[in-house]
């Protein structure tokens, strides 16, 4: 964290032109930011200023954003508030999870960084200030937040399933057991009481939400690996009978 005088001196002794940070997640003292001749830059996993802070990938899926990307920014004393040097984007597919987006951004980030470093070396990098009015705080995820509220819109729940995969995993209770949802789709249909199972077969477990129906396709019961709904119903059909109210 470069807080000690010894660490700061070691950094100064490097006589570095530039420092690059990736997924660092901590604020740097101004003295450290000023040590390299060209300052410090960071590879941030979103299109700034849309999502700042801890969980930009998950929040972009959760919010239903059409695209995400990486931003190479000049670091300042704030958290993800520095001037933008380069932005690279890619679409968020309707099947993308946080896990799949991490993999895509892990490829995009180094490419954008190399391009940005070339621009800096050539004196072509143009810093662009962020519009704070467009910024959102991508707070850390929690297990409590991942619990499904069946009164929510089905499309929103489906996005949460993808955003919270692989952690903390969207979940609900059935027969007093916590069930993790690995995959689901949503449908727009006339509905009854939220949380009610209206169909359960090899095609999925159909659950009424506040708006539409969520079709559960892959679940995980306590002590087991994630399984298809067909396999779940073969052994635990009583947990998911039509008319059952999930909580």
Curated annotation (Swiss-Prot):
SUPFAM superfamilies: FMT C-terminal domain-like, Formyltransferase. Belongs to the Fmt family. InterPro entries: Fmt, Formyl_trans_C, Formyl_trans_C_sf, Formyl_transf_N, Formyl_transf_N_sf, Formyl_transferase-like_C_sf, GART_AS, Met-tRNA-FMT_C. One of its GO terms (cellular component) is cytosol. The gene is fmt. It comes from the Bacteria. Attaches a formyl group to the free amino group of methionyl-tRNA(fMet). The formyl group appears to play a dual role in the initiator identity of N-formylmethionyl-tRNA by promoting its recognition by IF2 and preventing the misappropriation of this tRNA by the elongation apparatus. This is Methionyl-tRNA formyltransferase. Keywords: Protein biosynthesis, Transferase. One of its GO terms (molecular function) is methionyl-tRNA formyltransferase activity. It catalyses: L-methionyl-tRNA(fMet) + (6R)-10-formyltetrahydrofolate = N-formyl-L-methionyl-tRNA(fMet) + (6S)-5,6,7,8-tetrahydrofolate + H(+). Pfam families: Formyl_trans_C, Formyl_trans_N. It is an enzyme of class 2 (transferase). The keyword Membrane does not apply. Its EC number is 2.1.2.9.
């Amino acid at each position: 964290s470069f807080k000690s005088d010894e660490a700061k001196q070691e950094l100064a002794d490097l006589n570095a032109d530039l420092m690059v940070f990736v997924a660092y997640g901590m604020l740097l003292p101004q003295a450290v930011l000023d040590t390299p001749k060209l300052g410090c830059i960071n590879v941030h996993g979103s299109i700034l200023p849309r999502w700042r802070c801890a969980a930009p990938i998950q929040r972009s899926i959760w919010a239903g954003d059409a695209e995400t990307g990486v931003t190479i920014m000049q670091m300042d004393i704030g958290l993800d508030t520095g001037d933008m040097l380069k932005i690279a984007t890619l679409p968020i597919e309707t099947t993308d999870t946080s896990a799949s987006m991490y993999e895509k951004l892990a490829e995009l980030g180094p490419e954008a960084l190399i391009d940005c470093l070339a621009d800096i070396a050539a004196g072509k990098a143009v810093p662009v200030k962020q519009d704070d009015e467009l910024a959102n705080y991508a707070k850390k995820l929690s297990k409590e937040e991942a619990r499904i509220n069946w009164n929510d819109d089905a499309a929103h729940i489906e996005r949460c399933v993808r955003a919270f995969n692989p952690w903390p995993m969207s979940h609900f209770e059935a027969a007093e057991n916590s069930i993790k949802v690995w995959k689901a789709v949503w449908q727009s249909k006339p509905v009854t009481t939220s949380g009610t199972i209206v169909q359960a077969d090899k095609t999925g477990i159909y659950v009424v939400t506040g708006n539409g129906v969520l079709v559960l396709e892959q679940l995980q019961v306590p002590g087991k690996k994630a399984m298809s709904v067909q396999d779940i119903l073969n052994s635990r059909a009583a947990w998911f009978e039509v008319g059952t109210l999930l909580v």
